[in-house]
Amino acid sequence: MVQSSEKIEVKYGEREIAEGTLITFPNPRPGRNYDIQITLPEYTCKCPFSGYPDFATIYLSYVPDQKVMELKAIKLYINSYRDRYISHEEAINQILDDLVAACEPLQMKVKGDFHPRGNVHTVVEVMYKKE
């Protein structure tokens, strides 16, 4: 076995993803119900059974209450799934849980439209509504 003395450099994007946190800012129009729709077409994770990569488009729709999600923070959060071994179902449920905890919306829907693999196309959709 050959050992390398080369230092492995962490790329700035990897560092931003690792250090990323979900950031919010005050809703500029509290009291008005309006829908924010975000599409994230480059979601990736790894199958917890095979280790093969899974790809999806994530659709996020929410009605904010007092806080709005910062878009770059959402992007970095979604990119953090890249090397995680996680099922489609758990991933979409976890995304919903984390985003709801961060911004406490009036309602939110997260849909994961996964690319077909092995002739199977999966869409997972979860919803939250404040009581």
UniProtKB/Swiss-Prot annotation:
Active-site residues from the entry: 47 (thioimide intermediate), 54 (proton donor)
Protein localization: Cytoplasm
EC number, as in UniProt: 1.7.1.13
Pfam family, one: QueF
Pathway: tRNA modification; tRNA-queuosine biosynthesis
Catalytic reaction(s) noted: 7-aminomethyl-7-carbaguanine + 2 NADP(+) = 7-cyano-7-deazaguanine + 2 NADPH + 3 H(+)
A single GO molecular function term of this UniProt record: preQ1 synthase activity
Binding site for substrate: 69-71, 88-89
Keyword Repeat applies: no
Entry annotated with the keyword Oxidoreductase: yes
Main location: cytoplasm
Alphabetized UniProt keyword annotations: Cytoplasm, NADP, Oxidoreductase, Queuosine biosynthesis
Family affiliation: Belongs to the GTP cyclohydrolase I family. QueF type 1 subfamily.
Name of the protein: NADPH-dependent 7-cyano-7-deazaguanine reductase
Source organism of this protein record: Microcystis aeruginosa (strain NIES-843 / IAM M-2473)
Source lineage: Bacteria, Bacillati, Cyanobacteriota, Cyanophyceae, Oscillatoriophycideae
Gene that specifies this protein: queF
